[in-house]
Amino acid sequence: MNYLKELIYRIRGEYTTEKLIKMGMRVGENFTRLNDVILDPAHCWLIEIGNNVTMAPRVHVLCHDASTKQFIGYTKIGGVKVGNNVFVGADTVILPSVTIGNNVIIGAHSTVTHDITDNSVVVGSPAKIICSLDEYLGKEKKRMKNSKCYGCLLYTSPSPRDRSV
């Protein structure tokens, strides 16, 4: 089955997480890579992903930026480091030379152009901090508890973040 999966990925020009790890990418435990996530295959050895990281559909992690090549003859290349306990929303682009701290939520359709500090929630293009993780989680717990939304569950078991405190 793994051979068939690998063959399909190769035909489509995509790489499995396992293949990228063999090519030098570093990944911690509990990494969830949803559909159509692109992890720069040409520079995957510059990507480091921590524990408990989720990348929603169509996230792009790029370690190169060729926007300057036509004008000055050089391509910018830089590593991307994603900390522990990070959620990256759908259609987000993470550009080269960026470090994302621990305990971070990145909203959908964001463009991460600079480092993100620990315990932050960021959104936008370019991504900007909108609040601390604790503020966001407090608001969301209250909202979910008081709303009648289908599929909203308030988990009472501690998250990996809570267990480390």
Residue ranges and their predicted role:
Residues 1-39:
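Extended, small-residue-rich solenoid/repeat segments and analogous flexible loops
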Residues 155-162:
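Conserved small/polar residues in nucleotide/adenosyl-binding loops
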Residues 115-153:
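A contiguous, mid-protein "functional segment" used to position or interact
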Residues 68-74:
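Flexible, solvent-exposed loop segments that connect beta-strands
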